[in-house]
Amino acid sequence: MPDRKELLDRARAMRREQTPAERRLWGLLRGGQLGGLKFRRQVPLGDYIADFVCFYPRVIVECDGGQHAESAYDAARDAWFRAEGFQVLRYWNADVLEHPHETAEAILRAVGRGP
């Protein structure tokens, strides 16, 4: 279980070293561009760090690479996020990179703000 300072330092490092998919999605989410939703990136929550968080509505968006295909860690993490009242949306890195606008539309639909 990481201490708070360690978690904050790790989140800062992750913001500096985003994956290409995270960078692409952040370009669509930042500054309320997506339906006025206010997202933050690499946010410590409990013992975890969420890729993107919008506190209203309570939604977490995760960009996943191949290492997430069958991760028990991700399942436990998602369960914790859900227990805290968050909706968890996961998208494959390849989908974010190849279809960024469709991914953004899917996020809007999931939170009830899309067509």
Question: What does each model-identified segment do?
Answer:
Residues 13-19, 46-111:
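Basic, amphipathic alpha-helical patches used to engage nucleic acids or provide basic targeting signals
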Residues 39-42, 91:
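Residue-level detector of family-conserved "landmark" positions at structurally sensitive sites
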